[in-house]
């Protein structure tokens, strides 16, 4: 991964523009555990968002897997996130109506894979949840939910794991177990962790990049990695199975009926007049 001169400014109504990233450049290896450290407002989450294709830069270039993602269309960015990236967030982002196994299977179904139960069981065993496949995620502890989120991120075999404050909602001991797990996976993948916890960053990070006011103020870069091939990869377009989409839609109707009906009405109008 090569990051060259990226900048990002947020324009806010009735307020001064906020410079989130200011001319940032660095290279990252193909494997290892990299921490992006900083206080609130430092730009660390914005950096993760632009590297993962969740947000766009105003200028600069980000080359990943042989492609400059700053030049990709929205559809191509979606394919990049689906194929190249795994995400782990503080809020877990699990679907409560689905079982543990179904939540993990969803990542494979979005890639068009079918009959992949063996992959789900294998990844559950790796994260220490081999007996939880049929459980509802609402029955799990915070640490167990985060392990499910990690399993979902890893099961599709992405190049990079992006973790934004993955231990923020956990107690210290549970947080350590989650970082131990990510550290183990970083032996074969690039794991990028955003955190404000300097102690965890120094203990677990192969490299710690610290931000303040949108700029890099320190970069340990103590460990030198071997950068292997940069061949261009083919990324898969996400495909959500109709039965899963229906289940999620029914759940949304249960909690937000008016919003869902309004969305359906507007969609019908759009398809009718715009095609």
Located regions from the model:
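Conserved ABC ATPase signature
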Residues: 136-140, 144-146
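N-terminal Sec/SRP start-transfer signal
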Residues: 232-270
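Short coil-to-helix segment of the ABC ATPase nucleotide-binding domain corresponding to the Q-loop/switch region
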Residues: 98-106
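Helix-to-loop junction immediately C-terminal to a conserved catalytic motif
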Residues: 52
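Conserved ABC transporter NBD signature motif
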Residues: 60-68
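Catalytic Walker B motif of ABC-type/P-loop ATPase nucleotide-binding domains
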Residues: 161-164
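A short, proline-enriched helix->beta-strand linker immediately N-terminal to the Walker B motif
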Residues: 155-159
